[in-house]
Amino acid sequence: MEPPSEPEPEPQPLAEASAAAPLRAPEVARLREEQEKVVTNCQEKIQHWEKVDNDYSALQERLRTLPDKLSYDVMVPFGPLAFMPGKLVHTNEVTVLLGDNWFAKCSAKQAVGLVEHRKEHVRKTIDDFKKVLKNFESRVEFTEDLQKMSDAAGDFVDIREEIKSDFEFKGKQRIAHKPHSKPKTSDIFEADFENGVKPKNTFDADELWARLEELERQEELLGELESKPDTVIANGEDRVSSEEEKEGADTGVNVVSPVTDSSAASSCKRRAGNAGLPNGQVNSLNYSVNGSNSYHSNKDDDEEEEDDDDDDDEDDDNESDHAISADNSIPTIYFSHTVEPKRVRINTGKNTTLKFSEKKEEAKRKRKSGAGSHATHELPAIKSPADIYRVFVDVVNGEYVPRKSILKSRSRENSVCSDTSESSAADVEDRRGLLRSTSSEEAVATEAGGSSLDELQENHPKKPLPSGVSEAFSGTVIEKEFLSPSLAPYSAIAHHALPTIPERKEVPSEVSEEPTKRVSKFRAARLQQRS
């Protein structure tokens, strides 16, 4: 059995491409001939596939009756013209050609199913050829009519196509707006003031300006009310919500703190306001004591800080000293890392680099050379942790030489921060004695109680410390980049050139003697310089 061959592609007619050019009789005749050839070829193909379909039908009938007997007597073809008698055995075994010389053995029943599948393919091919035949038969008829028209009218034929204008659009037609188009007349409001009567909704210019000023005053009032933090004082402590602290830290608006008649509460208020503002700047703080409001600007705060510097050397015996005036607050230093335009990095050899400013060092050398070789070396002001490393240097021939470690001294005699000199040792003893006297005064103030605090202040005025001794700063240092309540402040020591803030000391419940404190290198260096 041979599989049916694929139908050949139908030849494309020559055309209708000639319709654009003027039609002539020879061209129309040739077009008709080509179309007739396609029709004839389709008819031949249809006849061929119909014959194949008949052969498959006969084969299918034979395969159905073949397994009825074990053997059949048949004439076996021996060449194109010779036959010889033979016997057909194994009637239920059929070899089927699958294609490309591939064969498969199957039973007679399976072979019948294969024949039926191939017959379906043959029928589909015949239907396709019949459609092509019908299409080209209609074209042949059209070409015959066209040839008759060309023969009657000559070489030119007028072809007209009727176009209906009533097309139906599914979507709405969109119209682009002009960039500077005028508004529609329906949207324009025309006021009629012919009778001299004004509508109720219109205002005069004066009324409009008055209304605007009233709205501005309301905005200012609302802004001031929103900027006031709601402060609650309970058991002498300040409780401010975290949201108001964030608002006070982010925006530099006026902060109004309502306070009771207690003077201690006013000092607590100011402390909370100062701690919430960055860089230690208080922007327009408002203190209300006994119903009277007093506004302090940044300049007033600076003057108050200068007054605090003068009172730094006095002993803080009790807490009421800080509650009397609103100038005292918890000592806090707000700092930012030092950024200088020009720096020189000096490698000390142990993964440490010291940074110096060329301009500052040059100015210091000039001052030292002008004052003399035995002039006192001036310590740099400590404003950030980076400035601490500038203190720990040795002076050799009037120049700074960095140390390998800030915990060791290369030259004890020429060191700026040497703590082994005789003067520093003497100052240490003086300082220890001063601390003992201060602790005894604190013990007396504690026993006296809260009722006798005012009497102690009147009878025992504060004794100023010696001029050569300056009290060290032992408050809190907060970096401005990390203004968060969760961060724990750490203690630091400020230089004597900086304004020191008196520390607020809490009165202990029981009398206890203060043990002797050790003197740090910073204090020893400062005492040595003062001597």
UniProtKB/Swiss-Prot annotation:
GO biological process terms held by the UniProt record: cellular response to growth factor stimulus; cellular response to steroid hormone stimulus; negative regulation of intrinsic apoptotic signaling pathway; negative regulation of phosphatase activity; negative regulation of transcription by RNA polymerase II; regulation of cell growth; response to virus
GO CC terms: cytoplasm; cytosol; dendrite; mitochondrion; nucleoplasm; nucleus; RPAP3/R2TP/prefoldin-like complex
Record Pfam families: Prefoldin
Bias type Polar residues, positions: 257-266, 280-296, 414-424
Composition bias type Low complexity, residue spans: 13-24
Modified sites of kind Phosphoserine: S369, S439
Example of a GO MF term: protein phosphatase inhibitor activity
UniProt keyword annotations, A-Z: Acetylation, Cell projection, Cytoplasm, Mitochondrion, Nucleus, Oncogene, Phosphoprotein, Protein phosphatase inhibitor, Repressor, Transcription, Transcription regulation
Biased composition range(s): Acidic residues: 300-319
Keyword NAD found: no
Region (Disordered): 1-24, 224-381, 408-470, 500-531
Expressed in which tissues: Expressed in the spinal cord, ganglia, choroid plexus and olfactors epithelium of the developing brain. Expressed in skin, lung, kidney, testis and muscles (at protein level). Expressed strongly in brain and kidney. Expressed weakly in skeletal muscle, lung and liver.
Compartment(s) where it occurs, according to its Swiss-Prot or TrEMBL record: Nucleus; Cytoplasm; Mitochondrion; Cell projection, Dendrite
PANTHER family documented for this protein: RNA POLYMERASE II SUBUNIT 5-MEDIATING PROTEIN NNX3 (PTHR15111), UNCONVENTIONAL PREFOLDIN RPB5 INTERACTOR 1 (PTHR15111:SF0)
Chain's role: Involved in gene transcription regulation. Acts as a transcriptional repressor in concert with the corepressor UXT to regulate androgen receptor (AR) transcription. May act as a tumor suppressor to repress AR-mediated gene transcription and to inhibit anchorage-independent growth in prostate cancer cells. Required for cell survival in ovarian cancer cells. Together with UXT, associates with chromatin to the NKX3-1 promoter region.
Protein known as: Unconventional prefoldin RPB5 interactor
Species name: Mus musculus
